[in-house]
Amino acid sequence: MPERSTDDGYAERTDWWRTAVIYEIYPRSFADSNRDGVGDIAGIRSRLTHLAELGVDAIWIAPWYPSPMKDGGYDIADYCNIDPVFGQLSDADELFDDAHALGIKVLLDFVANHTSDQHPMFQAALTAPAGSAERDRYFFRDGKGPGGDEPPNDWISAFGGRAWSRLTNPDGSPGQWYLHLFAPEQPDVNWDNADVQEMFDGVVRFWFDRGVDGLRVDAASAMGKKAGLPDAGHEPGALFASSDWVDNPHWDVDHLHQILRRWRKIGDGYPEPKVFVTEAVVNGPERLSRYVRPDEMHTTFNFDYLKAGWSAPRIRQVIEGTLQALAPVGAPATWVLSSHDETRHLTRFGRPSTGTAVMGFDSSNVATDLELGTKRARAAALLTLALPGGAYIYQGEELGLPEVEDLPEHLLQDPTWERSGHQARGRDGCRVPLPWSGAAPPFGFSADDVHPWLPQPADWHRLTVVAERSDPDSMLSLYRRALSLRRELAGWRRPTFVWLHTPPDVIAFERGDGLRCVVNLSDEAFSFGDLGTVLLGSSNALEEKVLPTDCAVWLQAR
């Protein structure tokens, strides 16, 4: 396969975001400072040194805005404030200052496809009549059939069930329906409405003016809807369970790109231009590349890589397809293994089927080999951090945390659980609070006598930051060494990428300055012979230049 390197000046660009390693913080589960069992901003500030020592370039903070918390904070009632459970605006300002002092950039989650149903704009729409200016800011429609008892169309929700809910008029009679592609408490806004555009423009400027370095645009591919809201033609069920959901008239619609261009102009107007990352779940890398054209977003989440599983042909196909699609638009790739929406990859890699469905719809209920998953996760870390472009680390990934799959049902909070009729447990298992220190829960996440909002497994005493920091063979030590080498050796930050000839189930490539990565996904050991001198391995068992199965190594060519 050909070398992947552009001739449009990309190699000379030094924008920090092109090769950044960004650490996702889910604030409820990061660190609790005030003994209420829920993580907060002061907790994040108290643990920033861990992230600096880890060697990340930026943090991305999941929603911390005022919210009824019907979807973990992704139902936002006030975009320009902080939910009291996390702190206040002054805490956020201090966090920005602390992070910047450590050389860490800050990105915030930005949810613009929908608001909370408690947002003042939606509350005003509820009290306004049909056809009013207030209702035009969302999608209110009359129903179909006798008495309007059927939804306006057949669209289905990402969390299961139909994407429409019906209002009750003040006199008790049935009213109009409103659209929500996610939970009923998350009504979709109408991006053709000027009031909506101006409101979100103000939100963008509010956070940029406070010193935020960038925004991660949640559910960007959902923001456009085809005119007339035509039927999608799907069978009943969950949006993400459908094989052709990406072709829906409410997903990846072309005119949503004008919204992204609007924000890019705002961000580019600052002395140090701001950065946008988009979450776009679309059909293939070619469609994905449209979101990172020069006048749109800077980078985008790579779900194809996340879903590739532990398959050499599939991983190779995704890497090649991603680099081919992004090169013409001059955008860097990003690589991600886990997030707050996915079953943790260590657990996925310990299963017979190692891929994942998006949005946490993982109901496989099969036994997991965590030893195998850990071995593969270590190799996947070296693979991911060796690829050209940027990378994401989801909190706890650097500790080798598995999915918590035995949370008591009465504690599950993800709306997927209820909306799916208790068929899909949702995403709570990847959101369990982090273990920092100690021999028993809450492992330093909170005070010893506090019960976290989700319980931690008792055996996580082996996976605390303190325990792993002193163990040279731990997952944390591996991540720290890999990130240190990634910063130290400039070749990892260059766009050069050349495939090396290896057996089908062995992935090998060369980056700049003769840096090489070899990953053995086969059932047999692989001899890497004279490919180079070992810099770092996912396993210490690299005798006689032999790479065991499910292991990876970084090499320096002679």
Predicted regions and their residues:
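Active-site and adjacent substrate-binding regions of carbohydrate-active enzymes
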Residues: 1-532, 537-558
